Amino acid sequence: MTKFIVNKNDQNQTLFKFLKKTFKTTPISVIYKWIRNKSIKINSKRVNDKNYLLKINDVVEVYDSNKPIIRDQFNYISNVNLDIVYEDNNILIVNKPNNLEMHSIYNLCLDDMVKSYLVDKKEYDIYLENSFVISHVHRLDKLTSGLVIYAKNKISSIILTNAFKTKDQINKYYYALTSYDWNLNDFLQVNGYINYNSNTQKADFSLVEKNNYKYCQTEFKLVNKNLILVKLITGKKHQIRSVLSFYNNPILNDFRYNGKKENDQKMIYLAAFKIEFKSLKKPLDYLNNKVIIKNPDWISRR
């Protein structure tokens, strides 16, 4: 028998979803069988309702000791060096350097760095968390630098993830240095379609709709010569890089998209430098109208 005590990050989710997250390697058919055969007790009473909504301090007992519980597994990093731009009880915003992956099993990655930092602060304990895992709520490409938001608890994760889906509650802005002087309109809104090929690790952009292409929207505003302010409306993989390449203005040092070489560093001149919170729901409504800015180091040299 395995026992869990429901905490604040487990509550208000169904029994089935909780079990699926907690027993990650257990086949779903087995979890259904547990529920169907009443092999689960909640507060000492057998249940067979997969949609039962868990409440804080509920005691969940699973009568199958052969199925492993998979806790969050990550590479702990001692004395981690994070560039923290903003932090409160619910969220953490860090400045990701170039050439650092968001997530990796084998290499140093931002996820492991953030988790290690929160473990050191005693704000994250994998042995006390049943179904919640600290995670970023949006991503940046490996070669792109800039601001990344992490949710410290379940409710914050839900609110922020949904906010990015609605596209009007959080605004993200980038600085991009193009390989050549900007030769388009000072303000350009681009609506089109994009497809990322995992084999070539490149995205293809099209102004007309094609099969397997997803809609994307980007705004570009000229700042000075080849310095461009970019507002990302949709967040597709390599969206900014592929759109700029389509218009023959590839990002400086972005060899994959035919950008001009600036140096031998594993980086491109693209940085997510500003986040605006607009209309987040409670309990994150205190963030509304807050603007977080972290300019890239190279901006002062242009």
UniProtKB/Swiss-Prot annotation:
Its EC number is 5.4.99.-. It holds the Pfam family PseudoU_synth_2. Gene3D superfamilies: Pseudouridine synthase, RNA-binding S4 domain. InterPro entries: PsdUridine_synth_cat_dom_sf, PsdUridine_synth_RsuA/RluA, RluA_PseudoU_synthase, S4_RNA-bd, S4_RNA-bd_sf. One of its GO terms (molecular function) is rRNA pseudouridine synthase activity. Keywords: Isomerase, RNA-binding. One of its GO terms (biological process) is enzyme-directed rRNA pseudouridine synthesis. Belongs to the pseudouridine synthase RluA family. This is Uncharacterized RNA pseudouridine synthase MCAP_0714. It comes from Mycoplasma capricolum subsp. capricolum (strain California kid / ATCC 27343 / NCTC 10154). The lineage of its organism: Bacteria, Bacillati, Mycoplasmatota, Mollicutes, Mycoplasmataceae.
